[in-house]
Every structure is written in structure tokens, then in C-alpha cells.
């Protein structure tokens, strides 16, 4: 997969993309991530990339020309015969989910456009953006961190990026439930023990315990995730008992 990121702050990406799994994925050529500084494409003498909003109001808006020319340069270099999926990170976008990550992980190339200030000129969105995606409802300073989140979520889904055992952490493995509690050595830490079932070696009991923990945790903290799930009879019984307790 080729990922191209259009941003005013390419240096922000050095940490996350220069570390651990994302770094290794690039070294293994499973993903090719390149950042482009929109400011390099500004034609005005002072390399200005923002201007006052027509109609007045607080804040500044990113001007269309540098973004348009940067996007044109990137699409030329990708040398495609059809327009490239161009994702604008935006609070107005559809909320990013694991399902969306799995959908995007199938793409051959993706362009991410990161806004700044109050946002970008609408004409860019109308002409170049194919998808607007949001990572959640809070105010941020720019679209860069959302772009990193989405690239992280997508990259780990590319075959070969995660070692086989790690890839079982996928939603399909837990089928959308919150994860059971994790424990590792030592068996006693500050006088705190590990649940004995996990030390029993009885994998049927362990799997049952973990499944019950996941269902109870999901019921308590994210009942919305439970709604869409197919539970076995005994599991549905657990949920019914939890609901009764809650009444
Ligand atoms: C209702 C609520 C969501 C709180 C809201 C209303 C109005 C503005 C803002 C706001 O944050 N504007 C600033 C910018 N925000 C984001 O880019 C951004 C923010 C959040 C999630 C995201 N996922 O991708 C990009 C995201 C837009 C231009 C530069 C940064 C947020």
C-alpha cells in the first residue's frame, strides 16, 4: 500500500512512523508512507498557506492553491489512471471504526489531507476529497494526529505486518467485545495475585473465564457493542442475569 500525507507539519509524523510496527512495516516494504509539506507548493512569495475567511469571523482558513497543487503533484507521482481515494480528516466526517479500517486496508493507495487553523477552503473538499473521516468528537489543533491514528489502524491489518499470534487480537477474534483482563509474571506482585483459573492449565475453563470477563466488561462499559453481537445460548444467559442484577 502507498500512503501519501498532505500536511503543514510533516515532521509530526517522524515519531509514530519511525518507530516499532509502523517502522518495520515500511522496512519490509509492506507499506510506503510519504509526507508532503503543503507549504512547499505555495506560490506566493511569503509561502502563505492561510488567509482570512470570506464573510468574516475568527480564525484562518487554509487557502486552496497550495493544497490543490500539492495534491496534483502527489497524484501525478502515483501515476494512476483513476482518481486516488483522498481522505480529509475532519470533525464533520463519518466516525472512524474498525470496520472502516478493514475497508481502507484493502486500498492500493490512499491520500490523507490534514487540515489546520479552522479548516480548508470548501472548494478543495468539493473538488478533491472523496471521504471525510473523523476520529471522534473533541476539538483538535489539526488533522495530523487523526491521520496517524488511521494509518496505525490500517497498517496493522496489512498481511505480514503483525506476527501471526499478534494478529489474533483483531476484532474478528474477540468479535467486537472488550478484551478480558491480562496478567503476566510475577504470579504475586505487591501482594496481588493472578486469578487462579489462569494458572490452572485448564484451557477450556480459561477460555470460558475470558469469554465471561469480556461479556461482563462489555455489558458494563460498552453495552452498545453488545447489541450487534451473536451470543451463544449460555452467553445470552449471562447477559440476562447481568441485566436482572442491574434492574
Ligand atoms: C464538534 C467537534 C468535533 C468538537 C468540533 C466542532 C468544530 C470544530 C472542531 C475542531 O476540532 N476543529 C479543528 C480541526 N479539527 C479536526 O481536524 C478534527 C477534530 C476532531 C476529530 C477529527 N478527526 O479528524 C480530524 C478531526 C479542524 C481543522 C483543523 C483541526 C471540532
Swiss-Prot record:
Membrane-crossing residue ranges in chain numbering: none
Main location class: cytoplasm
Function: Specifically methylates guanosine-37 in various tRNAs.
Location in the cell: Cytoplasm
This enzyme's EC code(s): 2.1.1.228
Pfam family, one: tRNA_m1G_MT
Subunit (UniProt): Homodimer.
Record-level GO cellular component terms: cytosol
Family indicated by similarity: Belongs to the RNA methyltransferase TrmD family.
Any one GO molecular-function label of the UniProt entry: tRNA (guanine(37)-N1)-methyltransferase activity
Binding residues annotated for S-adenosyl-L-methionine, in chain numbering: 115, 135-140
Any single GO BP term: tRNA N1-guanine methylation
Reactions that this protein is recorded to catalyse: guanosine(37) in tRNA + S-adenosyl-L-methionine = N(1)-methylguanosine(37) in tRNA + S-adenosyl-L-homocysteine + H(+)
InterPro entries on file: Alpha/beta_knot_MTases, tRNA_m1G_MeTrfase_C_sf, tRNA_m1G_MeTrfase_TrmD, tRNA_m1G_MTases_N, tRNA_MeTrfase_TRMD/TRM10
Protein name, UniProt field: tRNA (guanine-N(1)-)-methyltransferase
Keyword Repeat belongs to the record: no
